[in-house]
Structures are given as C-alpha cells and as structure tokens.
Design a protein with these regions (language model features):
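Conserved NTP-binding catalytic cores of kinases and kinase-like/nucleotidyltransferase enzymes
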Residues: 1-96, 231-232
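An alpha-helical support segment within catalytic cores of ATP-dependent transferases
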Residues: 16, 20, 172-221
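Active-site acidic catalytic loop and adjacent metal/ATP-binding pocket
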Residues: 39-51, 55, 202-252
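ATP-binding pocket architecture of kinase catalytic cores
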Residues: 51-150
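A cross-family kinase active-site recognition segment
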Residues: 125-188
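Active-site activation/catalytic loop segments of kinase-like enzymes and analogous catalytic loops
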Residues: 251-294, 309-327
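Alpha-helical scaffolds flanking conserved acidic
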Residues: 299-313
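ATP/Mg2+ or Mg2+-diphosphate-binding catalytic cores
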Residues: 311-350
Length: 350
C-alpha cells in the first residue's frame, strides 16, 4: 500500500500527536499514512509514527479491549515460538481502545524489519515451504491452547467477525462458492454448477457431523508475504497484522496452508485440463507430505483434512476468482469447465 507523509502542522498530524499522548508517548517526528479501508462504511486508517508505533483508526467495532487482550496473549505465544511480533499498547487509563469521533483508535509496536513480499523474488518456493512448516509446527505446539470465541477467516460453518461485518449469513468460502456457481450458470453450465453444489453439500454435511470434536489452535490468520518478516538469510523471522486472528480447526487451517498451485496465464493457455488437474493434485500431495512431517494428525483429523482440502480446492478465494476470470476468456472457458468437472467428480485425496 502506498504511504503518504503527514506534514507537521496539519490537522491530521496534530490529531495523531494528541492521540499518541493518551498512550503516554509525547514525541512525534514523522508520520506516514496508509489507507486500507474497505469502502466508506469500513474505514481503516493506519499511521506509522517514527517507525516505532502504528496508530490504527477504524470505524468498525471489531476490535475491543477484550479482543486486543486475547491478541496480546497470542502474540506472546508467537514470541515464545521464536517469532518477532509487535504487541498492542495500553493507554494511560489502562485500556487499549481510545474513542474519537465515532471511531476506535488503538496503538501497537512497529516491527521494523524486512517484509518477505519485498525480497521474495528468487526465493519464492523456499519461502512458501518455510511458511507451511512454520504453520504446522505452531499448530503442533499450541494445539487446543487458550482458545478464543473469535474464529478465523478460514472458518467453515462458524462466522468470523469480518463475515458478520460484511452482513454474511454464511462463511466466506460458501460465499465464494456461490459466486462461482452463479458465474457458471451465467455461462450456461447449469449441470456443472448443480454437480458442484451436490458435492459441496455432501462434504459439508459430513464435516458438520464431527468438526466440533476436532483439535483447534489460535492462528495469526493471514500469513501472506506482506505480513511476514525475514532475516538477512531470508528466513521467516516475524509476523504482524493480527486483524484476522482467531481460533480454527487445525485440519482446516492446514488444508488451506497446503494450497500451493496457482493458476497463471501460461498454465491456462498451454496446458490441457487433465494436465492442470494432475499438476494441482501433485502440488497438494507434496504440501500434505511436508505438513505431515511437522504435524501429527489423528485419523479423524486427517479424514477432516481431506474433506477441507477439497472445499479449499474450489472455494478458496484465489481459486474461485481464477476460475471465474478464465471462464470469462473464450480461449480458456472450455478448459475451466472440464477442470471443474474433474474436481467435482474425482475422488480427490490430499
């Protein structure tokens, strides 16, 4: 995201300095602003102060004192695990939240380290491997530790805070899936859409019968390379941005972490649907083999992992968006349809 420098003497600069004083920090030299808002009803303003603090001003009431307290406990676990992670700081009155003009304001430390996204060229696959190992090891160590009522964005069935904020009555993957089947129907692929609906309902019905019995863990929830830091050897060394954090069924979280196939123009234009399906399942099998070296699934968990994996294959956002994008391209549409038929019909095994 693009940063904008806030000039000393401006109204915003004075507001930032005033708010910072409430947290016991009086000195302000430089302020950089980034806007990660999701429309006018979901304002997310971020102010980087002296490369030491981040002041966030949000309109959505997702963050509360209780939520930030539980996030600090999670951050402490990541630190114990060997990762650098910035904690949230309390104001002088002992609370994390300061209210201003109908918005909530809160402060955290700033992790002034190299972001993986800036150095991933040349080591992308190595970083992806490190990320899967890191997540699997964390899940193994902190299985069922200090679980929270807040669920992660990966959640199936239970709604995350941002699902609720968006007005959804279904989980995000179900919403993604509905968009995909709607696009298939618009393209005249009614039989395929119906077959996918049948498969999705069957898998979800099976999962619903036992998912509440499965081990869980609280995760950071958004380990993309813009939220991960690396050391001088390009080893993952820290993480930040805990907005999406929450409790998740470990089998589901790992099924999403295992996604390691990306639909590109080169692949979609030069490969057949059968070849793409083989590439997809091979990549997933390799990820699964790696994850199993660091996380010990129970038989019931691995049964769930296989079911969650298939849901991720056709309902994870980056997959559904790719399917819809290439479905709209005449030269790729038939290939997407055949690929989705294979995903629906094949007895996929992660």
């Amino acid at each position: 995201m693009e940063k904008t420098e806030i000039k000393n003497g401006s109204e915003i600069y004075d507001t930032v300095r005033e708010l910072l004083c409430l947290f016991g920090a009086d000195s302000v030299q430089t302020v950089e602003f980034t806007d990660s808002s999701h429309g006018d009803l979901d304002i997310r303003h971020n102010y980087l102060i002296d490369r030491k603090y981040v002041l966030r001003i949000n309109s959505a009431p997702v963050m509360t004192d209780g939520r930030l307290e539980e996030l600090n406990r999670l951050i402490e676990r990541y630190r114990e695990f060997g990762m650098h992670a910035p904690k949230f700081l309390k104001a002088k009155d002992g609370r994390f939240i300061v209210e201003r003009d109908g918005n909530i304001c809160y402060l955290s430390e700033y992790l002034d380290e190299t972001v993986a996204d800036d150095v991933k060229d040349g080591c992308l696959e190595e970083l992806r491997t490190q990320r899967r190992i890191f997540i699997a090891r964390f899940a193994e160590k902190y299985r069922n530790v200090d679980l929270t009522e807040t669920v992660s964005m990966y959640s199936i069935f239970d709604l995350s805070p941002y699902d609720k904020l968006d007005g959804l009555e279904i989980d995000e993957k179900h919403d993604n899936f509905n968009h995909l089947t709607a696009d298939l129907q618009k393209a005249g692929e009614y039989a395929l859409a119906e077959r996918l609906v049948q498969e999705n309902e069957s898998i979800r019905r099976e999962l619903r019968s036992f998912y509440k019995e499965l081990p869980r863990c609280v995760f950071q929830g958004d380990e993309n390379f813009s939220n991960l830091c690396v050391d001088e050897n390009r080893r993952i060394s820290g993480l930040f941005d805990f907005n999406m954090s929450g409790t998740e069924v470990i089998a589901n979280y790992l099924a999403n972490a295992a996604l390691n196939f990306f639909y590109t123009d080169e692949i979609m234009q030069s490969r057949s649907a059968d070849e793409i399906y083989r590439m997809l399942t091979k990549a997933y099998a390799e990820s699964t083999e790696l994850i199993r070296k660091y996380y010990n699934f129970t038989p019931q968990e691995f049964r769930a992992y296989r079911l969650y994996s298939k849901i991720a294959m056709y309902s994870a956002y980056w997959n559904t968006s790719a399917f819809s994008e290439y479905l709209a391209q005449e030269q790729c549409a038939e290939k997407v349809v055949r690929l989705l038929w294979k995903i629906a019909e094949e007895d996929f095994r992660a």
